[in-house]
A protein has these predicted regions:
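Bacterial N-terminal signal peptides that target proteins for export
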Residues: 1-10
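Selective detector of the "anchor" transmembrane alpha-helix that sits immediately C-terminal
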Residues: 418-442
Length: 452
């Protein structure tokens, strides 16, 4: 009987102890609803559809905070970040050592994971028919393969009737993180590319025509028959452009970019990632191993100064920025899959949250702790949800929706739920203590009886 009580007691205690600490995570205080704030930002076009959707959804919750994000490319975003003309930047490429020296104490906050597609316009060919290896892709962009029916392409696609047409190569004309990701992949799979062209946000292209932003390259491909180029997955869906299956790093499979294959490429990356305030240069999930890993996958980042006095003299802007980015990398992740981005894992969210807690304004923490404790719901699984192949165009104007009494009631109910949960936990602990006291008392009585 005593052993059984001890076992039950131990079980109850372990149940309480195993409640994850992340279940009740701290959060920064909400923006002051009585103060209007505009946050200016710029950078990568790669995550622009997602950032633009965040702008709208965050604006519904906090209509007094407006995000003005300019999709000018990672290169332009980094330049503006270094010159301190924007509040934060977005980039698909981590800062190089020289850029980190020019912008010291910059935090890298992962915001999403995406894939760069090899998109093409082949009249008469349906989506997903074309298969390409990294070496063939490199030779196309080197200008060595100039026809779609070149034996190097035809041998990878037996049974597919490829046209005897000149290939029109489309690439970025601006400094771009998408370019950095793409050419980093080419440098890994082609020694000739690595030696002749190399890696960067902007390179000397051996062949092709340029387009500004992912939007521009997508437009070139869509309007130019027999063209091929590289664009982020969301833009391929958005513009209904077919894209190729690319040979994986192991050489065992041709993999289409998808939620599952991009997630597979990022699987296992979290434990190896640095902290937000550390260098991210060289961090990559490009050409990650795995039978179903899409080889041209990447994190995309928000760049934020630890000292916000570098970019603003307004305390409300500083406080609102911290809250908004915290929302983007936690609650905002639920919007990622609808635009074909992979949400960041809870462990990666924590890197960003820990980084935000380092942010200072006027010598004090810009992270002001909220009075309530929020539940952080994990948002990524090993098999992400497959969504319909349609993506809304980026929003032109913010949709401002005033907070309703229902929203206020929801917040009060969440707070009440938290207190009820805490009360239940305290009651459980009290019950355990009573059981322990009973056991001790029974043991003492038994001991006294034996002595008598």
């Amino acid at each position: 009987m005593t052993k059984r009580i001890v076992a039950i007691t131990t079980s109850l205690l372990m149940t309480i102890l195993l409640i994850p600490a992340s279940a009740f995570a701290s959060s920064p205080v909400e923006p002051d609803p009585g103060v209007d704030v505009q946050i200016d930002a710029a950078g990568a076009s790669f995550p622009f559809p997602l950032i633009d959707l965040w702008r709208v959804e965050y604006g519904k919750l906090y209509p007094n905070v407006q995000l003005n994000y300019q999709s000018i490319g990672s290169g332009g975003g980094v330049k503006n970040h270094i010159s301190e003309t924007i509040v934060f930047a977005a980039s698909d490429a981590p800062l190089k050592p020289t850029e980190s020296e020019a912008a010291p104490n910059t935090l890298h906050i992962p915001e999403a994971i995406g894939g760069v597609t090899i998109a093409y316009n082949l009249p008469g060919m349906s989506e997903s028919e074309l298969k390409l290896t990294g070496e063939v892709i490199a030779d196309i962009f080197l200008g060595k393969i100039t026809k779609f029916n070149d034996p190097a392409i035809q041998n990878l696609n037996p049974g597919v009737s490829l046209p005897d047409e000149d290939i029109v190569v489309a690439h970025r004309s601006d400094g771009a993180g998408t370019t950095f990701v793409f050419v980093s992949y080419l440098a890994q799979v082609s020694q000739e590319w690595d030696e002749k062209v190399g890696v960067g946000k902007s390179v000397e292209w051996p062949a092709g025509i340029g387009g500004k932003g992912n939007e521009g390259v997508a437009n070139v491909i869509k309007t130019t028959p027999y063209s091929i180029g590289y664009i982020e997955l969301a833009y391929a869906f958005q513009n209904d452009i077919p894209y190729a299956a690319v040979e994986n790093a192991d050489g065992t499979n041709f993999v289409l970019p998808s939620m599952q294959s991009i997630a597979a490429a990022s699987a296992g990356a979290a434990p190896t990632l640095p902290q937000a305030h550390e260098s991210w240069y060289g961090i990559s999930i490009i050409n990650a191993p795995g039978d179903n890993s899409y080889p041209i996958s990447t994190f995309t980042y928000l760049l934020v100064y630890e000292n916000l006095n570098n970019v603003t003299n307004d305390p409300d802007t500083a406080q609102s920025l911290v809250h908004m980015i915290h929302w983007m990398i936690t609650d905002g992740q639920k919007f990622s899959e609808s635009l074909h981005y992979v949400p960041i894992a809870p462990e990666v969210q924590k890197i960003g949250i820990d980084g935000l807690k380092r942010v200072q304004f006027n010598g004090e923490s810009a992270w002001v702790e909220s009075d309530t404790t929020s539940y952080v719901q994990p948002v990524i699984t090993e098999q992400p949800t497959v969504v319909e192949e349609s993506v809304p165009q980026p929003y032109e104007q913010p949709i401002v929706v005033q907070q309703t009494n229902n929203q206020s009631l929801s917040s009060e109910m969440e707070l009440l739920s938290f207190y009820i949960t805490a009360l239940i936990a305290l009651i459980a602990i009290a019950v355990i203590l009573v059981i322990i006291l009973i056991i001790v008392n029974m043991s003492l009585v038994a001991s006294i009886k034996k002595k008598i």
